[in-house]
């Protein structure tokens, strides 16, 4: 049986030595979020890991000096930057094309979903709302309460709930005018398109992450977490989030120079050629 030259991994893998007897391995993360796991994915050494920015490249080289890292840029955004991603057909969703569109893209935990009002779509009735939850929110039994709330919001005329098999966030990033999210890679991705983002800091935490146990939440996050406030508008409550959403959509938004500096720090080069650089490296190192 023919063996592949390269195998891609998205996380740590305990038996790389067996793979390396036959093939080379490349690691490529699915996002650039603030969790410490972004860096600890390199605890198992792949042949190469592709990273997005000078900052991340330098940190990883310092943490894992024996490993091979290649700074190629943020390839996930290439289809939008190159004009290959067409976005969403609002007509098929039953949306009013004259209204601006809000993308709510929460993560599964810790999440803002349970902290939102049951009347969330009504509070923003003058806008189209697309809800793109994390796959776990839509599939795991432990997040049933989240699903119940999501399906309730889906019943509003101005709201579309993405299906489980709508796995790609890119069409929604392309088409929306404003994004509301928790601390996730999506914040950086949307802001990189020079669009406004609201970062929900009011989260539903399990009891063992609250009060004297709050250190557990902080332990999940990397120091990059603090940079999100420079890229997105933090909202500390639901009512503050609603007010900010209306204000941002009614204004002529332009990303600040400071925000652009932080975006470059975390997401690196966004020239549409990151994927080509990856392919070139693979072909030259077969």
Task: Describe the residue ranges of each PLM region.
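Structural alpha-helical scaffold elements that stabilize or flank donor/cofactor-binding regions
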Residues: 1, 42, 123, 171-172
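Active-site and donor-binding regions of nucleotide-sugar-utilizing enzymes
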Residues: 1-84
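Conserved catalytic-core segment of nucleotide-activated headgroup transferases in glycan assembly
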Residues: 72, 76-152, 162, 235, ...
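Active-site donor-binding acidic/aromatic loop of nucleotide-activated sugar
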Residues: 158-165
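C-terminal alpha-helical cap of glycosyltransferases
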Residues: 270-286
């Amino acid at each position: 049986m023919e063996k592949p030259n390269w195998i891609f991994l998205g996380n740590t893998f305990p038996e790389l030595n067996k793979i390396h007897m036959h093939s080379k391995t490349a690691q490529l993360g699915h996002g650039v979020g603030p969790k410490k796991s972004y860096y600890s994915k390199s605890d198992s050494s792949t042949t190469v890991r592709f990273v997005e920015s000078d900052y991340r490249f330098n940190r990883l080289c310092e943490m894992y000096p024996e490993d091979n890292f290649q700074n190629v840029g943020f390839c996930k955004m290439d289809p939008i930057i190159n004009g290959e991603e067409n976005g969403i057909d609002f007509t098929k969703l039953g949306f009013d094309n004259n209204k601006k569109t809000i993308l709510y893209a929460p993560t599964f935990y810790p999440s803002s979903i349970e902290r939102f009002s049951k009347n969330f779509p009504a509070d923003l009735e003058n806008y189209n709302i697309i809800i793109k939850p994390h796959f776990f929110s839509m599939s795991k039994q432990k997040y049933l309460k989240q699903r119940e709330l999501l399906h309730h919001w889906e019943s509003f005329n101005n709201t579309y709930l993405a299906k489980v098999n709508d796995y790609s966030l890119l069409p929604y990033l392309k088409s929306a005018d404003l994004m509301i999210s928790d601390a996730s890679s999506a914040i950086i991705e949307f802001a990189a398109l020079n669009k406004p983002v609201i970062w929900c800091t009011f989260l539903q935490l399990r009891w063992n992450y609250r009060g004297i146990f709050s250190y557990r939440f902080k332990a999940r996050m990397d120091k990059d977490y603090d940079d999100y406030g420079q890229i997105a508008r933090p909202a500390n409550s639901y009512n503050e989030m609603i007010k900010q959403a209306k204000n941002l959509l009614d204004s002529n938004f332009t990303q600040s120079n400071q925000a652009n500096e932080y975006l470059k720090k975390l997401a690196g080069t966004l020239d549409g050629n990151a994927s080509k650089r990856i392919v070139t490296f693979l072909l030259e190192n077969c």
